[in-house]
């Protein structure tokens, strides 16, 4: 259950931050970066955090379930599991982001990173704190 708590707590928070950053960059809002713009950005992030969890908790838990399934497959090492979960997060976020009016390579990458980074970060944290140590067997 620690794995799902990690994915549910970390995933939407990081994904929402990256989604706000991606839409800010894509809209051309940050032509000049100064402390006033950064404070407005962080204020908007804090104000929209509740909606980030509202819309992000279910996809984060779904990716957490995929990570849990891959954890129980003994032949998949941690690094491969991390890459698979990241690729699934990237693909899911890219497909969801393709519904936006803008399209192109930059939109594809920015929307994909919104799913890639939280999925890989949550999987790594779950590996550190939720996975039981595996016994080492001699041949």
Question: Regions from the language model: what does each represent?
Answer:
Residues 1-139:
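Juxtamembrane/disordered regions of integral membrane proteins
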């Amino acid at each position: 259950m620690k794995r799902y708590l990690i994915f549910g707590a970390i995933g939407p928070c990081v994904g929402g931050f990256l989604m706000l950053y991606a839409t800010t960059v894509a809209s051309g809002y940050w032509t000049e970066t100064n402390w006033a713009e950064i404070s407005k950005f962080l204020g908007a992030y804090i104000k929209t955090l509740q909606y980030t969890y509202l819309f992000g908790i279910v996809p984060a838990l779904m990716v957490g379930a995929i990570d849990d399934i891959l954890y129980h497959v003994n032949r998949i090492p941690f690094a491969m599991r991390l890459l698979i979960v990241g690729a699934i997060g990237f693909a899911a976020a890219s497909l969801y982001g393709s519904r936006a009016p803008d399209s192109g390579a930059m939109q594809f990458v920015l929307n994909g990173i919104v799913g890639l980074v939280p999925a890989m970060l949550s999987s790594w944290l779950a590996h550190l704190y939720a996975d039981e140590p595996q016994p080492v067997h001699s041949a």
